Amino acid sequence: MDKFKGLHTSLQVEIGAQLKDAAKSGAMSRRELLVKGSLLGLSLPFLGGLIGFDEPAFAQAQPKSGGVLKLGISRPRGSVDPLTSRSRSEGFVLKPVLPPLGRLQADGSLAPGLAESWSSNEDATSWTFTFRKAKWQNGQAFTAADIAAALDILLDPASPSPTVSGYRGILSHKSYEVTDQQTLVFHLDRAYVDFPYIVSYGATAWFPKGYVQGDFAKGLTGGVGPFLLKEYAVDRGATYVKNPDYWDAANIHLDGLEIIFFDDDQSMALALQGGQVDALPVLASSAVLAINANPDFEVLSARSSAYNSLRMQVDAAPFNDKRVRQALAYAIDRQGIVNTIYGGAADVGNDHVFAPAFAQSAAVVAALPQRTRDIEKSKALLAEAGYADGLKVTLVSEQYADMPQYLQLVQSQAKAAGFDIKLDLKSQADYYGADDNQPWLSTPFGATDWGERATPGAMITPAYLSGAPFNESKYASEAFDAAAKAFDGEVDPVKRDKLAIDAATILHEDVPTIITYFAQTRRPVNKKVQGFPAGPASQLDLTGTWLDV
């Protein structure tokens, strides 16, 4: 290990040794080693050296340069802006120009992006990021001060940005300092091992110092990404040209990019089949079926942590009784739903957020028995809770993607156990609402589509911790809060797995949210598109993508 000490901190070397032992003993797969190592900033050659592997070598066609890649995405709500961005579609529009600090890979690892390296202190309460030397479109140098200025705006309690919810209790406003032109030090509110993921995933886009809301739509935000915005129309889409000054321009083979907006998945699928677009970063499973049979297209897939929550507010009857929540959980045939909606191309859930896409999943699965359908047990629990004659409830949700089909199956399956569920499906705009009218947060019984997150903590912090801003189930558990926060701050991989088991077990037992499955990312592409990333669903890194025409 001595040869690596000049390249990594003592903490990284120590944890690297632990990862090596786990990998050599067979307790950890190659994928798990990549994920757990990359969050500490360990490079792939370093990780490969631990157990004697390097990056796999495959015989691949030589990339061709040129051409414009056309993508179809769901229409964003309103004008896209980095200050208010919250959805995948908005992220797809922003990220070609305003890229992430780290590039999240389909296998869950984190590759350098605008940040070329990162490291933490011994207890993961302080993180140091070193940024690449780059320049904005106007020729101004990109520096650590740009990131600090963006955070000043994004984390300001008065800001319109939703970004603050993901940082709550982790990083406070102004708790970071520029130590030199390319270095920024983050001083966290608590230990957080996955912090590099927090600043790298989702719809957050890093804009230049002096940015004013609305500048992006006006074409005034010349970014440091692989592409430069040429034209943006809120009702149609956006076009881009290659950025010749991008730090990795040699691996950007496309001359340009065009993003076209669509109102529904069926329209996107038809556009792909008709040649209007070349690839679809996200598509509902029901719309994928017809494409699967067409030899001109390929459907790329990757595991994801995205799920449709079936959540119950635990602070009022009938769902304040854990037995009612458990009864509904036992009434559902999870594998049947996965087979019916996804043709088996999804992972069965077990009422906790530690999805198979996460490195801790194997440990959790080994320790926590899978909940399966048991109608008799469901009826017994419902009777014990005082509902021997059954229970009538209204389930409020959104008319979006696969959600209606999913809830109709839940409605049908739960009936056998005594649940009489009435569905109230609203438009997405009405379900999420605004201000004091947000049904997804206020309705006693609801179902929400939660997009993937890069880490378990990124799922837990905004939605499951006591008092969290998007805690739609009103769940509050001191034991869970303690386990989840300890997990976030534990640097030892073995101890961290144990804490993941503790947190997952509490959620599974309390079941504020039924998580039936984790949907895989499905990306249909024309076969002329080469090197297109299979995932993750919320990111679109076009490094190495090219057109075989």
What are these regions (language model features)?
Residues K70, T143-D152, Q181-H187, G225-P226, ...:
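Alpha-helical secondary-structure segments
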Residues D347-E384, D402-Q405:
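Structural transition elements
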Residues T130, T163-K209:
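Surface-exposed binding/hinge segments that line
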Residues Q105-S109, A191-Y192, Y197-G256, D264-Q266, ...:
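Gly/Pro-rich hinge or "lid" segments in bacterial periplasmic/extracellular proteins
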Residues D245-A290, D420:
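Ligand-site clamp/hinge motif
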Residues R371-T372, K422-Y431, A458-K527, V549:
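Extracytoplasmic/peripheral linker and loop segments enriched in polar/acidic and small residues
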Residues M1-E32:
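N-terminal secretory signal peptides
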Residues G72-E122, D152, L220-V224:
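N-terminal lobe/hinge region of extracytoplasmic solute-binding protein
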